[in-house]
Regions:
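Single conserved hydrophobic/aromatic residue that forms the stacking wall/gate
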Residues: 1-12
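A general structural motif
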Residues: 14-15, 161
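Histidine-centered catalytic micro-motifs
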Residues: 15-25
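Intrinsic-disorder/low-complexity accessory segments
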Residues: 25, 31-69, 73-79, 83-285
């Protein structure tokens, strides 16, 4: 599901991507923008301004249908690993919808009886209001996306001689799995031409890769490797960090300047490992 959605966005460059969810029964309906102080610093003001403009369409349609709703509170727009925020770092507008759940056919809630049919109707209203915004704000959305990639390219030009390096000399499998994720997101990854020692860490051929910063996915690359430890707000609804190489327990650095690019990586061929004995009494790792 998430892979198909991501592949579609890579090919089509959605202007708006809506992410429909459910929350606890005694709530109403939420739509973004979220809490202002919990928006990721790499997400532009232009993105949030457009999100607010689109929100006016939800307000109008919910008011016309007598639907209770809220916005600008509780939920944040920080973690790029979720469906409503990932588009924001890829030139689109991601919008989260949260509908109070009926948890089945019908349920009593603080706001009265909540039937399943009503929850579906509310999500439909939100979807249709998004389409209405898409049509009426077409030129603004198109310009926003063009500007996003123009500005990203312009910013990446400041790093023409800089690259990110990552690797692990003890486990190429984890390194390759990280590289697979990057390739799926159309990020240019290169093999090393020679071993590189950087900040007393040796990155060896076959166990390490280089990512030139000067490429079209500069903003996404920045988000993936960003080591963020300072926050405007101490509260989070979701996840506060997304430094992907830590998930693979890899060495990495974002500021390598003395390097030679090897062959461009096209696909990953993982080593074939011997099958673990099926009927073993125990395993020693």
């Amino acid at each position: 599901h998430s892979n198909l959605r991501r592949q579609r966005q890579m090919c089509i460059r959605d202007s708006i991507l809506t992410d429909h969810h459910e929350m606890e029964t005694n709530s109403t309906f939420f739509f973004q923008p979220g809490v202002k102080s919990r928006t990721h610093p790499l997400t532009s003001k232009a993105n949030q301004d457009l999100t607010k403009k689109i929100a006016k369409y939800h307000v109008k349609n919910f008011d016309n249908n007598g639907v209770l709703y809220f916005s600008g509170e509780r939920f944040d727009d920080f973690f790029y690993g979720k469906g409503s925020t990932f588009p924001d770092i890829n030139g689109s507008i991601g919008i989260l919808f949260e509908q109070a759940s009926s948890r089945g056919h019908i349920q009593n809630s603080a706001n009265g009886l909540l039937p399943f049919s009503k929850t579906i109707k509310n999500q439909l209203i939100a979807g249709l209001s998004s389409l209405e915004a898409l049509v009426e704000l077409k030129e603004e959305l198109h310009k926003y996306q063009l500007d996003f990639f123009k500005n990203s390219k312009k910013e990446s030009n400041n790093y023409k001689n800089e690259a990110i390096i990552f690797g692990d000399n003890t486990d190429s499998y984890r390194v390759n799995k990280m590289a697979e994720v990057l390739l799926r997101h159309e990020i240019d990854v290169y093999k090393l031409k020679e071993n590189i020692t950087h900040k007393k860490i040796v990155y060896s051929l076959g166990n390490s890769y280089l990512i030139p910063k000067n490429q079209k996915k500069f903003k996404l690359i920045e988000a993936i490797f960003d080591k963020r430890i300072n926050f405007n707000d101490s509260l989070f609804y979701d996840v506060s960090a997304w430094t992907l190489p830590y998930a693979f327990d890899l060495n990495f650095d974002m500021g390598v300047t003395n390097f030679k690019l090897g062959e461009k990586l096209q696909n990953i061929k993982n080593k074939k490992y011997k099958k673990v004995v099926d009927n073993a009494y125990a395993y020693l790792i």
